[in-house]
Amino acid sequence: ASGYEWSRVEDQLAQEHTVYTLDLLGCGRSEKAGITYTNFLFVQIICDFIKNVIKEKTDIIASGFSCSFVTTAAAYDKESINKIMFINPVSMISLAQTTTKKDKLFKFFIELPIFGTFIYHIIVSRETINDFFLDKLYYNPFHVDKDVLDAYYEAAHKGGYYAKCLYSSQSAKYMNINIRHAVESIDNSIYIVEGEDEPNGAAIVEAYQKVNPAIESATIPCSKHFPHIENVEAFLEQVGAFF
């Protein structure tokens, strides 16, 4: 992931808000560490950033897997986080999956110095990233921006050998956590935005609302995983209505 995904909306948001675009450890422009990344590591980073940098109660917009970090952070530190907007969050069923022996073996092989690095470079090659964006992330393939692809390619390779540690940790489910209780217990205002063509998007939103009926939602037309990139105007309209 990369903070670059917010480049099309951050200037507009900054007109009425103080905006911080945070690349978490191992992501985007941030340092790549040779560690096993976990959900709670990112929870600590988010809470520490709010406490030490922002220094006031904070509204958060998060997308994809990062939504689980924010959910846990809101349950862990109720005084730091105010309103929350999620963009296409990962399903709670998927997040509840735990690491298996097969997952641990995969992580071991990916983190091998030569063989693992070779496999990782195939997985994050320009061609693979391009195909993934076209097939999985964009509603309209003609919307794919070369600068976005370049940012994600750079993020996947920045940091040399340790660049692969985030991927190996996520693939082996070390970053997973069952957030059902957190979703149920937090009393923050939560608004889920889903792309019209996001696979299982409607079912995922329904599952969150079943656990916490106070959650509101909206669907952004002509978009998939990145409504804040593909349909900026409609996305900003939802942000303006919520915050």
Language-model-derived ranges and their functions:
Residues E5-W6, S30-T36, A96-T98, A203-I204:
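Conserved catalytic-core motifs of eukaryotic protein kinase domains, centered on the activation segment
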Residues S185-S223, I229:
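Conserved loop-alpha-helix segment in the C-terminal half of the alpha/beta-hydrolase fold
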Residues K55-K101:
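Conserved hydrolase catalytic core segment
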Residues L95-Q97, H121-E184:
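Conserved alpha/beta-hydrolase catalytic His-Asp/Glu region
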Residues A1-R29:
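Conserved HGGG/HGGXW glycine-rich cap/lid loop of the alpha/beta-hydrolase fold
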Residues L24-G28, S91, K224-P227:
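Alpha/beta-hydrolase active-site loop signature
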Residues F40-T58:
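Conserved acidic catalytic loop of the alpha/beta-hydrolase fold
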